[in-house]
Amino acid sequence: MLYMIINLIKYYSFLSLVIIPITMSANDITMPPDEVLKMPLPLPYNGEIYFESDIERFLDSSINKSKQPIIIFGGNWCPDCRILEGTLQLPTIKKYMIEHYEILHVDVGRYDKNMNLISYFKIPKEEGVPRVLVFDNKKNILNMESTKEWTTARDRKQQEIFNYFQALVQ
């Protein structure tokens, strides 16, 4: 009996050495528990009107810098937009985002500004911001099915938000 237990321990120890590295990604960074949102929350939207040509320049510029472009549609009136941005400004996340991404914040006002750009990307014009678009280096939207994911940012853990962006890095 003792022999079987020892063999089981060896077997599961071996499995843990093999399985854990497979299930953990190199991108899995855990945030330190002392990183918390700072008040007041950021106001990342400046009211600027963008044209399709501005968006194309942003995408090209980001890709030329070997960064993945992110466009975040939102407004400073929206608590979820501000919470998402505050989370992206936490030191661990900010460092990671700067290394991998270039972000453009597009102000939608009260759904009366820059809405043509949402149509430009063939995203349904639904209310709810922030709308986050993450691109690859060929300008394909990687998260088309989850662009509305962070309209509930206030209900999410900071690590969950961080994991989302880590998973989309290419």
For each feature predicted by the language model, list its residue ranges.
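Typically the conserved alpha-helix immediately C-terminal to a functionally engaged Cys/Sec
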Residues: 82-96
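Extracellular/periplasmic catalytic domains that process cell-envelope and extracellular macromolecules
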Residues: 63-64, 95-98, 124-128
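Solvent-exposed loop/turn segments at secondary-structure junctions
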Residues: 76-80, 108-113, 139-141, 150-151
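Non-catalytic, surface beta->alpha helical segment in thiol-disulfide oxidoreductase systems
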Residues: 127-170
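Thiol-based oxidoreductase modules, predominantly thioredoxin-like and allied folds used
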Residues: 97-115
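Bacterial Sec-dependent N-terminal signal peptides
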Residues: 1-28
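N-terminal leader/targeting and pre-domain segments
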Residues: 28-65
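Short active-site neighborhood of thiol/selenol oxidoreductases, capturing the structured segment around
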Residues: 64-78
